[in-house]
């Protein structure tokens, strides 16, 4: 009985243990399945979140791409507008107005009229100028009207007309003594698209004009070289990056052109070469039958006048004060023979002899000396022989110095000293007498400007001035109809006072 009970209990325990073990395994599996399901759910959630983020990112990328495209389009539009504006800014098409004028009044120390002008000395007849500051009483005006256009093919056109007038009268109405004159009227054609090689970018011109590359010494009112007339030519033929040339043909008339018997014309063929700061200019002149030209009374004007001539210029244009300091300077050596012996105004003097020879040197510079002081020296000298009569001689030299002392931005004190020596032997031509001697001029001029007070080339200016002049007594005898020695204007010292305006734009 005991063994049966014991066996029954053992069987019951084993059965219970197996059942408990089985129950434990099922619970563990269910727990694992639940955990796995939870992890799967979390993974799905994370995947969904990632998918949402990816969608948002893709949408943002699409938005950015669209914005970038919009910005690109906007940038292109801005670039196109900018290009159009730049083209419009560069396009100088339209009308322009430019001008030059000077006008003033002058008197001597007695409150009466006096002589003045840059060419009042005997040397002035052959181009010997002196300082102009406080030494001009005329009214002279130049008015320039231009029309420019740029075509779609890049070609340019320019038309210019200049009207000028000069007066010595102080009256407001001067029509009866007016010298109103059309000094220039010409057309230029530039950047022609069919021009290639050296002619690419060159400019054709024709008409009545001052040559583009003339230059002067402003303080003594003298051109270094002045080529002008009616004709045609071409500018800026470029042989290489450093060498360019101009070629032109000008025509001028000698004598009274109203005289129907005067058919003498002077033709000037010019080559003008530029290599960096260097300039080399050569001209040939011809005036057929100039020695047979008659005046308005039918008399022979000058039987020994030249029919041909040559002219040459060697120039140096510096962008510094003779290479020594900041500033600018220009220097030129000129030579002329025959009709070319008038070396400043090429082809303007029909009385020159076939054997006439002239040498001239010209130089000027500008430089600041300090914050308030600036200086502009100038020199002009000439030697001419066999000019109008056999054996004649005209020698002179001018030295000029102008100083500017800036007081403030609108007021300066200008000082000018001018000295000229001359030795003239005209050999009786035009009843002129042989003389030699010196001329002196000193000027003090308080000056008002709107700005750039120390700039020698900025205008407008209003000047109040006083000048003192004196000269060798012998110079009074040069001619009966010139300034020196005339009534009330003799050596021994002459004072003058005045006010003048000058402007250009």
Curated annotation (Swiss-Prot):
GO molecular function, one term: carbohydrate transmembrane transporter activity
PANTHER family: CRYPTIC OUTER MEMBRANE PORIN BGLH-RELATED (PTHR38762:SF1)
Organism: Salmonella typhimurium
Primary location class: membrane
Low complexity composition bias: residue spans: 62-72
Protein role: Porin for sucrose uptake.
Short name of one Pfam family: Sugarporin_N
Keyword Membrane: yes
Domain comment quoted from the record: The C-terminus helps to anchor the porin to the outer membrane.
Stretch list, region Disordered: 44-87
Location(s) in or outside the cell: Cell outer membrane
Protein name (record): Sucrose porin
Quaternary state and interactors: Homotrimer.
GO BP, one annotated term: polysaccharide transport
UniProt record similarity statement: Belongs to the porin LamB (TC 1.B.3) family.
Keywords: Cell outer membrane, Ion transport, Membrane, Plasmid, Porin, Signal, Sugar transport, Transmembrane, Transmembrane beta strand, Transport
Signal peptide: 1-22
InterPro entries, A to Z: G_neg_Bact_CarbUptk_Porin, LamB-type_porin_N_dom, Porin_LamB, Porin_LamB_sf
One GO cellular component term noted in the UniProt record for this chain: pore complex
Membrane topology, as annotated: Multi-pass membrane protein
């Amino acid at each position: 009985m005991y063994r049966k009970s014991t066996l029954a209990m053992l069987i019951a325990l084993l059965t219970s243990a197996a059942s408990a073990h089985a129950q434990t395994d099922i619970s563990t599996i269910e727990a694992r399945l639940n955990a796995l399901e939870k992890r799967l759910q979390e993974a799905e959630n994370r995947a969904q979140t990632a998918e949402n983020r990816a969608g948002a990112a893709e949408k943002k990328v699409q938005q950015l791409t669209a914005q970038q495209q919009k910005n690109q389009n906007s940038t292109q539009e801005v670039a196109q507008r900018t290009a159009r504006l730049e083209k419009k800014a560069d396009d100088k098409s339209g009308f322009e107005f430019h001008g030059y004028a000077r006008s003033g009044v002058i008197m001597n120390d007695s409150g009466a009229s006096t002589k003045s002008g840059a060419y009042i000395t005997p040397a002035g007849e052959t181009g010997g100028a002196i300082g102009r500051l406080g030494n001009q009483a005329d009214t002279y005006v130049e008015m320039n009207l231009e029309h420019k256009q740029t075509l779609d093919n890049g070609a340019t056109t320019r038309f210019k007309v200049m009207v000028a007038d000069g007066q010595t009268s102080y009256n407001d109405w001067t029509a009866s003594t007016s010298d109103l004159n059309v000094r220039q009227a010409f057309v230029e054609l530039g950047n022609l698209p069919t021009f290639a090689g050296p002619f690419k970018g060159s400019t054709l011109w024709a008409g009545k004009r001052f040559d583009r590359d003339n230059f002067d010494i402003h303080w003594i009112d003298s051109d270094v070289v002045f080529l002008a007339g009616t004709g045609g030519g071409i500018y800026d033929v470029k042989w290489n990056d450093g060498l360019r040339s101009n070629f032109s043909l000008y025509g001028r008339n000698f004598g009274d052109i109203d005289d129907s018997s005067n058919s003498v014309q002077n033709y000037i063929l010019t080559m003008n070469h530029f290599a960096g700061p260097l300039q080399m200019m050569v001209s040939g002149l011809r005036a057929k039958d100039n020695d047979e030209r008659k005046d308005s009374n039918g008399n022979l004007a000058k039987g020994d006048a030249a029919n041909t001539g040559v002219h040459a210029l060697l120039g140096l244009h510096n962008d510094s004060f003779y290479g020594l300091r900041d500033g600018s300077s220009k220097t030129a050596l000129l030579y002329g023979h025959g009709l070319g012996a008038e070396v400043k105004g090429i082809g303007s003097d029909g009385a020159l002899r076939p054997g006439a020879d002239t040498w001239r040197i010209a130089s000027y510079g500008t430089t600041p000396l300090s914050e308030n002081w600036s200086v502009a020296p100038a020199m002009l000298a000439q030697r001419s022989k066999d000019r109008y009569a056999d054996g004649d001689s005209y020698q002179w030299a001018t030295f000029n110095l102008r100083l500017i002392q800036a007081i403030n931005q609108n007021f300066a004190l200008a000082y000018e000293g001018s000295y000229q020596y001359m030795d003239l032997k005209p050999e009786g031509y035009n009843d002129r007498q042989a003389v030699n001697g010196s001329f002196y001029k000193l000027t003090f001029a308080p000056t008002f400007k709107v700005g750039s007070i120390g700039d020698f080339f900025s205008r407008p200016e209003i000047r109040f001035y006083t000048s003192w002049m004196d000269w060798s007594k012998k110079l009074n005898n040069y001619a009966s109809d010139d300034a020196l020695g005339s009534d009330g204007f003799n050596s021994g010292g002459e004072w003058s006072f005045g006010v003048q305006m000058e402007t250009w734009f």
